[in-house]
């Protein structure tokens, strides 16, 4: 699973990275994590890498997380987005971009919410059998 953290604060990236590492070890899930300080660099990378899960801070300089998510959605409709912020002010706007979840910082105070977000966003591999059944149904 390709995961990105997009947050301009190194402390917040470190905290989320530790939460992800603990969660993935606990559930024995493989993942690759890439961290970005801003939306522009993230979008450049997202043009080359198919991220399945993105944790996006809303308040960032130059390009906020809402704009970065809007641009990501133009190219990747299936990516799960979890917004990160210190306030719920932009929650409605985030969900208009098909956000999967909305986490408040600091994560240390909202660990149960992080666990819930991961459960909702966890991507399961699609089996070959499922694809074959889907292809057969499409041909009917």
Regions found by a protein language model. Give the residues of each.
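Cytosolic catalytic cores of cyclic-nucleotide second-messenger enzymes
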Residues: 140
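Conserved sequence signature across two-component system core domains
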Residues: 6-7, 36, 54
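Conserved small/polar residues in nucleotide/adenosyl-binding loops
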Residues: 129-136
């Amino acid at each position: 699973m390709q995961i990105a953290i997009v947050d301009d604060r190194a402390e917040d990236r470190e905290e989320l990275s530790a939460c992800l590492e603990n969660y993935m070890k606990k559930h024995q899930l493989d993942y690759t994590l890439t961290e970005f300080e801003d939306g522009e660099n993230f979008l450049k990378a997202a043009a080359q890498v198919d991220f399945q899960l993105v944790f996006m801070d809303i308040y960032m300089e130059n390009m906020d997380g809402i704009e970065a998510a809007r641009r990501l959605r133009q190219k990747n409709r299936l990516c799960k987005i979890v917004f990160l912020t210190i306030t719920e002010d932009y929650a409605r706007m985030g969900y208009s971009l098909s956000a999967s979840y909305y986490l408040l910082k600091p994560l240390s105070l909202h660990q149960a919410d992080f666990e819930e977000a991961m459960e909702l966003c966890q991507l399961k591999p699609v089996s070959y059998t499922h694809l074959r059944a889907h292809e057969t149904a499409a041909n009917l």
